């Protein structure tokens, strides 16, 4: 060991102080982007924040996928959740060893937003509507992610999203009303336990405003969160949030001013423009030259960042705990995932059906019976077993989704799909005989929202970039669900379809192509022809089973 910052026998704060004193101003600024610049003259590699690990490592190839966070909390078993966190950390280490440039050890998990609104489309990411349970589970998962070593972390857990974040619509410009009592009795009790225990070492603010102020500028970052943490706390922005301070929030007129205020409010790492750090570093340099920030502001942020890197053991002679590559999706991790899944199930009612008594044939019925639901932060599944497939391993099964098969008819003809998923059209109705397969759709009624799956290719109806309806989507696969419609009936037994994501209406355009229009009066009026009753089919299937 030649430099004190590389000496693991020294306290972390002494190592950070030594390293910071060796850095130039430009090198300090280079640390403040998500993709931190290397410092070759000191032998310091680049560093990347932000590996998704909400319930297993995500987005980097097949890895163990554990139950979603809300399922983990349903186990009410902190020890089990800690084991899941430890298994996730081990797999992160394997992937990091293979590709340190793209798989960093600062993990963006757990999510600790209390689930206060059932309409929030991201509730599966959090643990509970109860802040106490959320805090308990956050401590457990973060402790597993951080690892068992008392002085060195396997990964650096990050709590998100601070603060009062339960809304996706206009999430960058909407403001959450947060009275003091709600803050202190509901929101903070979910965030503070993992910070006080020292198992979470970073926090990510949320996109929204709180009481009219962007969350990325909240005084609570320095006054409350950092006061709760026993060590230096790193604060990372959410993706593109620094730029949001100028547009669309219009809180500041220029980026240098916005970034200066964010830095002074406590943001250390700017997640902006993906791996293109140049603009962010230029804005911070501009802010320094204009006197909007000082060298001390840079030192403070760099200290928070370097403290985490020191505690990750990056500068130690042996910087990583060695993990067998076969740990990824190992039998032990598969067994742990199965245990977590089993314990996450909550039995609400049982009319003598369970436990199953070795029936010879089981009817599996329902829209989700043969579907494995994933969330945005699911990892790449090494294998998939649906309810239908799992029961089929035990005994003979018969199956149907129990959905109606329909055709949608206008005065000009039927809504028609193509096998290749090109824009849909209206085609004339046949003079006699059955409706063509291309005009048949399976109707999934989610209660106020319909999804239409084209029989001709098994793909869902959505809109393309030109505003045409197409049947080319395997299912919801983006940040927002764009494959649902609202049926608006009229007194004549017909109705119109409104695309929920855009608020526009299904209409007939040029050459009988099917488009979306903002004008309700121009919407196509449809009659529904039921080709097959899902309820009737389900009853018939059920009658053949025990």
What role is predicted for each listed range?
Residues 1-546:
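Glycoside hydrolase catalytic-domain context in secreted enzymes
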């Amino acid at each position: 060991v030649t430099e004190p910052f590389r000496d693991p026998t020294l306290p972390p704060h002494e190592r950070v102080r030594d390293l910071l004193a060796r850095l130039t101003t430009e090198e300090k600024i280079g640390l403040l982007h998500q993709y931190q610049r290397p410092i070759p003259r000191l032998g310091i590699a680049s560093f990347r924040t932000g590996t998704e690990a909400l319930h297993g490592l995500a987005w980097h190839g097949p890895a163990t996928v554990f139950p979603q966070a809300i399922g983990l909390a349903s186990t009410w078993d902190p020890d089990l959740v800690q084991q899941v966190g430890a298994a996730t950390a081990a797999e992160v280490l394997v992937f990091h060893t293979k590709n340190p440039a793209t798989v960093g050890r600062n993990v963006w998990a757990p999510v600790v937003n209390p689930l206060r609104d059932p309409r929030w489309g991201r509730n599966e990411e959090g643990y509970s509507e109860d802040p106490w349970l959320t805090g308990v589970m956050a401590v457990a998962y973060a402790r597993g992610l951080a690892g068992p070593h008392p002085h060195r972390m396997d990964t650096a857990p990050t709590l998100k999203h601070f603060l009062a974040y339960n809304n996706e619509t206009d999430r960058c410009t909407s403001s959450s009303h947060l009275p003091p009592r709600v803050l202190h009795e509901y929101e903070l009790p979910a965030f503070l336990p993992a910070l006080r225990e020292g198992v979470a070492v970073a926090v990510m603010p949320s996109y929204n405003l709180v009481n009219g102020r962007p969350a990325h500028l909240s005084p609570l970052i320095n006054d409350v969160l950092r006061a709760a943490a026993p060590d230096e706390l790193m604060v990372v922005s959410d993706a593109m949030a620094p730029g949001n301070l100028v547009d669309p929030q219009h809180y500041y007129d220029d980026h240098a001013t916005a970034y200066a205020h964010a830095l002074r409010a406590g943001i250390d790492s700017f997640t902006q423009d993906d791996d293109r750090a140049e603009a962010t570093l230029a804005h911070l340099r501009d802010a320094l030259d204009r006197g909007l920030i000082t060298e001390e502001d840079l030192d403070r942020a760099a200290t928070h960042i370097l403290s985490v890197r020191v505690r990750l053991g990056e500068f130690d002679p042996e910087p990583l705990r060695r993990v067998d590559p076969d740990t990824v999706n190992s039998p032990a991790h598969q067994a742990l995932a199965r245990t977590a899944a089993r314990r996450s199930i909550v039995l609400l009612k049982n009319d003598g059906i369970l436990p199953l008594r070795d029936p010879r044939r089981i009817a599996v019925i329902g829209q989700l019976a043969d579907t494995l639901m994933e969330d945005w932060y699911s990892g790449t599944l090494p294998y998939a077993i649906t309810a239908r497939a799992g029961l089929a391993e035990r005994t003979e099964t018969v199956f149907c989704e129990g959905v109606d098969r329909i055709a949608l008819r206008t005065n000009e003809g039927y809504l028609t799909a193509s096998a290749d998923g090109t824009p849909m059209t209206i085609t004339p109705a046949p003079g006699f005989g059955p409706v063509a397969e291309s005009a048949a759709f399976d109707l999934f009624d989610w209660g106020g929202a319909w999804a239409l799956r084209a029989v001709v290719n098994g793909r869902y109806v959505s809109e393309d970039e030109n505003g045409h309806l197409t049947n080319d989507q395997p299912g919801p696969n983006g940040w927002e669900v764009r494959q649902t419609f609202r049926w608006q009936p009229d007194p004549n037994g017909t109705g119109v379809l409104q695309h929920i994501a855009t608020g526009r209406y299904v209409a007939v355009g040029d050459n009988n192509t099917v488009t979306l229009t903002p004008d309700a009066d121009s919407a196509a009026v449809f009659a529904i022809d039921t080709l097959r009753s899902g309820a009737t089919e389900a009853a018939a299937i059920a009658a053949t089973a025990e």
